[in-house]
Amino acid sequence: MKIAILYREEKEKEGVLLKEKLSREHEVVSFHEASASNVVDADLIVVVGGDGTMLRAARKAADGTPLVGFKAGRLGFLTSYTLEEVDQFLEDLRKGNFREELRWFIRVESDIGSHLALNDATLERDLSGKMVEIEVNVEHHSSMWFFADGVVVASPTGSTAYSLSIGGPIIFPECEVLEISPIAPQFFLTRSVVIPSSFKVTVECQREINLLIDGTMVGKTRRVIVQKAEKYVKILRPIKYDYVAVIREKLGYGRRIE
């Protein structure tokens, strides 16, 4: 098996350690993420970092190439192992003891280009700007209007990212839905809505505001169209991986108070 190890530049030590252990049984190439080509040619991509590194690695992976993440960041929702679990990973790799989890991208079209996001597309005002009137149209339905600082359109993967911090729900990754969440709306009863992923979402603002793709600023625009993309990433999980346990541990959600 050909394995590529992708790591943040400041995590080179951890990347080298993984390479040494994996090289005993597999062909291994390794590089820090900034030096990686657009598409990584390998049977498996091992990522050392946090969710940001996993997001960037997902874009570099060819369709169908699985990723497995080792947590070397803060939360690590997308990672599957800690750096102390390398031996367990090697054992799982030998026996094929993994579950496959498919995470799909959203496509964001605007006058400044076409982008893929695994988490979310965000339209938001400058810090010094005024609130914005925003029209959101869900395909086959009439429009909704918000007077707010912006709006987030998120995939299930993105439901535990920015969207969660502005009051959006946690969505299980297997769900085929999109989530629309206004940012700091004027009316406190305005809440997130969840729609089928088969519908396109058109967002139009009264003026140009910032467009962010997975938290990265790509420019200013007034109008975007968001829909589920055909591209997906395959993440390998240990057989005993438990999503509820992850959100309980990392977010404190549903934790029993003794």
Swiss-Prot record:
Known function: Involved in the regulation of the intracellular balance of NAD and NADP, and is a key enzyme in the biosynthesis of NADP. Catalyzes specifically the phosphorylation on 2'-hydroxyl of the adenosine moiety of NAD to yield NADP.
Compartments in which it is found: Cytoplasm
Catalytic-site annotation from UniProt: D51 (proton acceptor)
Annotated GO MF terms: ATP binding; metal ion binding; NAD binding; NAD+ kinase activity
The protein's Enzyme Commission number: 2.7.1.23
Class in the EC hierarchy, top level: transferase
Annotated catalysed reactions: NAD(+) + ATP = ADP + NADP(+) + H(+)
One CC-aspect GO term: cytoplasm
Name of the protein in its database record: NAD kinase
Single biological process term from Gene Ontology: NADP biosynthetic process
Entry keywords, A to Z: ATP-binding, Cytoplasm, Kinase, NAD, NADP, Nucleotide-binding, Transferase
